[in-house]
Amino acid sequence: GEEAEKVLYDSAGKPVLVFYTPLELDGLNWAQITKIDFEECFSNKAQGETDDFLTKFNNEYGYYDLFLMTPDGYCFHSVTKKADYRTNLLTGKFANSGLGKLVKKVLSNRQYEVADFEPYEPSQGNPASFIAQPVISDGKVQLIVAMQISLEKINDVMQLREGMGECGESYLVGQDYHMRSSSFLDPQNFSVKSSFKNNNLAKSEMISAALRGETDIVIGSNYTKTITKEDNIVLSAYTPLKFGDETWALVSEIDKSESFAMIYSLQWVMACIGL
């Protein structure tokens, strides 16, 4: 005599949403059961639309991918449908990946969490970062929503050129001294991908200070010295940036000669006006 809705697994191991209710006909007790693929509950397309709501959300906000997972770690929805789609992020081959560890953390802490960049096999081994949020109802985690952050979108922001001159750039560096945004001036050696792949560490006194939590504007030798072995003197402004539990270095730099050339030019204009 009970009626309820539950998420169960079919013979192929896919989650299905099952509705059941009792039904009495001519004094006989029957059971009315309705099943629907769990993924279809979230990915239906409106009439005339080419993309479902989650795909449009993913594209509009600039994420690389959007995942939905059951409380036991099964990824039943992915926008890009890479190798992690329809695998278990707690017990499967990607359990020790950044996303797998994030899912475990979200289930343990029952709150929004982030995973810093690290190589991720389903993305061709390129560095990937994730954010995730549990959906909680009746005191239980019913669903996990996770997004893979787009490196392209981070670079679009960090490589804005207004006010940077010819030799200026802004960039992000993690606690492991790998890039978190790609260098504008040396993308061959210091893109995020090459930084991780070739272990090209972006080290400078300014970056280390920012990672210690300091904020300042100084003149010093920038990170390219780790490759060129030559000092590249810059005017550097740096500050720490919190990303979940991690601290990144946010640095804006411009070549010393270019920065002082601007000052000398301004002084010359002011002198001319004074005459």
PLM features: residue spans?
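Loop/turn elements at helix/coil->beta-strand transitions in domains of secreted/extracellular proteins
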Residues: 29-30, 61-64, 110-113, 248
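Generic detector of intrinsically disordered, low-complexity, polar/charged segments
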Residues: 10, 83, 89, 95-97, ...
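Membrane-proximal, non-catalytic sensory/regulatory domains of signal-transducing membrane proteins
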Residues: 1-25, 67-70, 101-136, 168-171, ...
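Solvent-exposed, extracytoplasmic
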Residues: 1-3, 38-68, 72, 81-101, ...
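N-terminal membrane-entry
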Residues: 261-275
